[in-house]
Amino acid sequence: MAKSRFEYVKQYERLDRLLPETYIVIRIDGKGFHKFTKKHDFEKPNDLRCLNLMNAAARVVMSEFTDIVLAYGDSDEYSFVWSKSTELYERRESKLVSHVCSLFTSAFVFNWPKHFDIPLLSLPSFDGRAVLYPNMKVLRDYLHWRQVDCHINNLYNTTFWMLILKGGFTNTQAEEYLKGTVSAEKHEILFSKFGINYNFEPEIYKKGSIWIREPIDQEWHQQDKKFSVKQKKKMVLSILHVSLIDDDFWTSRPFLEVLLQ
């Protein structure tokens, strides 16, 4: 940038560098998606086309930022987990959040025709935020929270929409019918009224989607404390629909904690 007498205005910029040695999670959420889904006549309770589109957009973000180790998404939200040691953009919050959010949104629009056979009728938008977590326990608890939220919402929505689509209920009647019910009761409603065993519903609906960056280089061993630059370049992105809450997710993938350092 050329120097001039007007350069003094830079002093009014706010310093927003995120704390060092913390895990950065950038979460994006659909803005006004209830109206957006209604306008595009999304299937209820889940529209697999949109979930696949969200996953495709998340993959674009993961491919662009190699310091993102893991991402978790369900419905109209996605959380991107960064390596604790990342120094991208000098950890400036505004830069990181705006780049992730804008790239995700543009990837969503760009890939729309690959997943929907109708034109885009209105502009999708997403907001974003950055949250810092001090250690692996809290970071894992954050991911557990998002996945539990996915399960609770999906069980409710599945039961709610079956009552409307197949049970002849109105929205208000379905809400009143489900008021105060617990998970076991919703399972029973689905099975007794509609012959649906919720346990056999697609995992992507119940558990959400997890993108991970994983090595294909068999020379890396669990006792290794870091990956070489060459090994990182060989890594591939894989999508999973499994439980994040079980310890097995982490113990069977020890490379994740190494990458997150």
Swiss-Prot record:
Catalytic function, reaction form: a 5'-end ribonucleotide-tRNA(His) + GTP + ATP + H2O = a 5'-end phospho-guanosine-ribonucleotide-tRNA(His) + AMP + 2 diphosphate + H(+)
Keywords: GTP-binding, Magnesium, Metal-binding, Nucleotide-binding, Nucleotidyltransferase, Transferase, tRNA processing
GO CC, one annotated term: cytosol
Enzyme class name: transferase
InterPro entries in the record: Thg1_C_dom, tRNAHis_GuaTrfase_cat, tRNAHis_GuaTrfase_Thg1, tRNAHis_GuaTrfase_Thg1_sf
Cofactor binding: number and manner: Binds 2 magnesium ions per subunit.
EC number of this enzyme: 2.7.7.79
Keyword NAD in record: no
Binding residues annotated for Mg(2+) 2, in chain numbering: D29, D76
CC cofactor: Mg(2+)
Protein residues bound to Mg(2+) 1: D29, G30, D76
Molecular-function GO term, any one: tRNA guanylyltransferase activity
Gene3D superfamilies reported for this sequence: 3.30.70.3000
Pfam families reported for this sequence: Thg1, Thg1C
Record-listed GTP binding positions: D29, G30, K31, G32, F33, H34, S75, D76
GO biological process per UniProt: tRNA modification; tRNA processing
Family: Belongs to the tRNA(His) guanylyltransferase family.
Role according to the record: Adds a GMP to the 5'-end of tRNA(His) after transcription and RNase P cleavage.
Identification of the protein by name: tRNA(His) guanylyltransferase
Organism of derivation: Schizosaccharomyces pombe (strain 972 / ATCC 24843) (Fission yeast)
